[in-house]
């Protein structure tokens, strides 16, 4: 499909720079399978679900992936900003760096340059390899949990570029940019639909008879990237690692067999479930990378309802929601949201989409 079909104009003032407080006070645009639109708030989510429905959340935890350091060992020591994007093993990470032109394979970057050191000492990394788009492989001198601790002490929350370009990360973001379900470290972006949940909402869902299930998909930085090709078929999707346990797969299969609906909280949960589903819709255990790219025409196998935020134009995520609810419906829903003052992107409001069977 033509990529420009997924374009739209968004006023800069519609981009949320802070989350709603409390979290479940965010607005929620309900989009029924018929295309009908309803303006609601997240705390009303239980009213739109049924006893026996199964809610699936992503329990990935965002790491402090934004690091600042200096190149050492040469005549000059330029400042280097690095964003960790994918763990390769116990000591090696793929990262995006700026300015990339200042680094060559073999260079050493020392993080925590402004007098900041972690409790375990300074954090050094060698540039092991360099790609054409500014991505590099960093081989750190520390390993495993010790490296994780050093990154946590020296790093900052990796806010999306549309927020970071307007303000610097602060102490509030350390909590705000983490869901209440966060347990398994590895994401460099939050599964933002999960940011809307509170203990009160969780209790209300349980009282409604909706069961809660956890999966893990470590969200990568590629989630923010627009599709730059003119045709969606030419786009290369980024891969992210995810895990669906046998216990959770069995529970979700049982819920569906009893006429319950699978409600994915976030596109990350949906992409993992669709990756783990067979043609008959049954879920199997999954622990692997997924690069599933969902565009209109895709036949959904595992998910019946999707709760998600409002996404960027020309993004793979707007293409996904257009596949789920229909492109015409989502264009109309987004136009309504913009006109009605909904807040967009990671810290913004939510949509609740009921799958269009056609």
UniProtKB/Swiss-Prot annotation:
Protein name from the UniProt record: S-adenosylmethionine:tRNA ribosyltransferase-isomerase
Q: Per its database record, what is this protein's job?
A: Transfers and isomerizes the ribose moiety from AdoMet to the 7-aminomethyl group of 7-deazaguanine (preQ1-tRNA) to give epoxyqueuosine (oQ-tRNA).
Highest taxon of the lineage: Bacteria
UniProt cross-references to SUPFAM superfamilies, sorted A to Z: QueA-like
Q: Which reaction does it catalyse?
A: 7-aminomethyl-7-carbaguanosine(34) in tRNA + S-adenosyl-L-methionine = epoxyqueuosine(34) in tRNA + adenine + L-methionine + 2 H(+)
Q: Which family does it belong to?
A: Belongs to the QueA family.
E.C. code: 2.4.99.17
- What keywords were assigned to this record? Cytoplasm, Queuosine biosynthesis, S-adenosyl-L-methionine, Transferase
Could you tell me which InterPro entries the record lists for this protein?
QueA (IPR003699), QueA_dom1 (IPR042118), QueA_dom2 (IPR042119), QueA_sf (IPR036100)
Pathway of action: tRNA modification; tRNA-queuosine biosynthesis
Any GO MF annotation of the entry: S-adenosylmethionine:tRNA ribosyltransferase-isomerase activity
Which GO cellular component terms, listed alphabetically, does the Swiss-Prot or TrEMBL entry include? cytoplasm
GO biological process assignments? queuosine biosynthetic process; tRNA wobble guanine modification
**One Pfam family named in its UniProt record:** Queuosine_synth
| Enzyme class, first EC level, given as a word | transferase
Where is the organism placed in the taxonomic lineage, from the top? Bacteria, Pseudomonadati, Pseudomonadota, Alphaproteobacteria, Hyphomicrobiales
Entries under HAMAP family matching the protein? QueA
Fill in the subunit field for this protein: Monomer.
């Amino acid at each position: 499909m033509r990529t420009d079909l997924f374009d739209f104009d968004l006023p800069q003032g519609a981009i949320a720079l802070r989350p709603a407080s409390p979290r479940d006070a965010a607005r929620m645009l309900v989009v029924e399978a018929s295309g009908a639109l309803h303006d609601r708030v997240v705390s009303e989510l239980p009213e739109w679900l049924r006893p026996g429905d199964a809610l699936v959340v992503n329990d990935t935890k965002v790491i402090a992936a934004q690091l600042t350091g200096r190149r050492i060992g040469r005549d000059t020591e330029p400042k280097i900003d690095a964003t960790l994007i994918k763990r390769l093993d116990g000591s090696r990470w793929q990262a995006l760096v700026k300015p990339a032109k200042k680094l060559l394979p073999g260079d050493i970057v020392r993080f925590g340059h402004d007098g900041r050191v972690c409790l375990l000492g300074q954090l050094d990394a060698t540039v092991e390899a360099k790609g054409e788009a500014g991505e590099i492989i960093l081989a750190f001198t520390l390993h495993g949990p010790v490296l994780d601790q050093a990154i946590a002490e020296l790093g900052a929350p990796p806010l999306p570029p549309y927020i970071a370009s307007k303000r610097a990360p602060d102490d509030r973001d350390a909590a705000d940019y983490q869901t209440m379900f966060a347990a398994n470290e590895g994401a460099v972006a939050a599964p933002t639909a999960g940011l809307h949940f509170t203990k009160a909402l969780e209790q209300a869902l349980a009282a409604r008879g909706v069961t809660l299930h956890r999966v893990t998909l470590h969200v990568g930085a590629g989630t923010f990237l627009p599709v730059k090709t003119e045709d969606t078929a030419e786009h290369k999707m980024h891969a992210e690692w995810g895990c669906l346990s046998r216990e959770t797969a069995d529970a979700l299969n049982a819920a569906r067999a009893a006429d319950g609906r699978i409600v994915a909280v976030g596109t990350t949960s949906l992409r993992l479930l669709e990756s783990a589903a067979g043609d008959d819709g049954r879920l199997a255990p999954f622990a692997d990378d997924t690069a599933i790219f969902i565009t209109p025409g895709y036949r959904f196998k595992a998910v019946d309802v999707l709760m998600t935020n409002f996404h960027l134009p020309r993004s793979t995520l707007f293409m996904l929601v257009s596949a789920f609810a229909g492109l015409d419906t989502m264009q109309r829903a987004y136009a309504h949201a913009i006109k009605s003052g909904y807040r967009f992107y990671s810290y913004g409001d939510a949509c609740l989409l009921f799958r269009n069977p056609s």
